[in-house]
Amino acid sequence: YIQAVETLVGVDRDWVPHSDGASLYIRPFVFANDVGLGVHASKHYIFCIICAPSGAYYAEGINPVRIYVEDEYIRAAPGLTGFTKCGGNYAASIKAGELAEEQGYAQVLWLDGVEKKYVEEVGSMNIMFKIDGKVYTAATVGTVLPGVTRRSCIELLKDWGYEVIEGKLGEVFGTGTAGVVSPVKELVWKGEHAYIGDGKIGPVTQKLYDTMTGMQWGKIPDTKGWIVPVEKKY
């Protein structure tokens, strides 16, 4: 996989944006291409990778967003595909996302598909809570995607001395490839509003965003070995 990405980025290196916040978005795909109809696993698949020059995810800077807590629709349920980067997961989220957007909310906070009371993900991102100086995020136990950005943030947080505990809510933020780290300022459930902090981006969220994007854009040293240099071969 890494070799394939290096080859493609080497070919498309001139498309890599150089402005702050911009990036060359890389997305791998695997899809079935058997000929015929029927419900069965495919025997043949196509693996491909696309690159897309992308502007800053936050056009006006990184600012907290308002989140709608969804307790009717579900994104995933035990035994299904919630733990994978599966296209069907996105399809299941469209209706709830549209309804939230109509009410002025940026994303949907997904609850578990059984009891609908445990937090799982926000939009298409993993979500994290800062509670009494500690950080909590949903476990990846079958319905939550073990995101790479999530894993990177957890590793950095542990390096900074944070651990998990229940307590008073201090910060909420989502983690994902495109947005990297997305702060949350408000949660709404059944007409009740929960305001996070003072409505501004919290210090841990800001530090995570600055560190992650700083390493991605070469502004600070990559101390984790996450950046792969691509040599010009073409």
What kind of region is each of these model predictions?
Residues 1-18, 23-35:
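Extended, compositionally biased flexible segments
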Residues 3-4, 8, 29, 36-234:
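Helix-start/capping segments and mature chain N-termini
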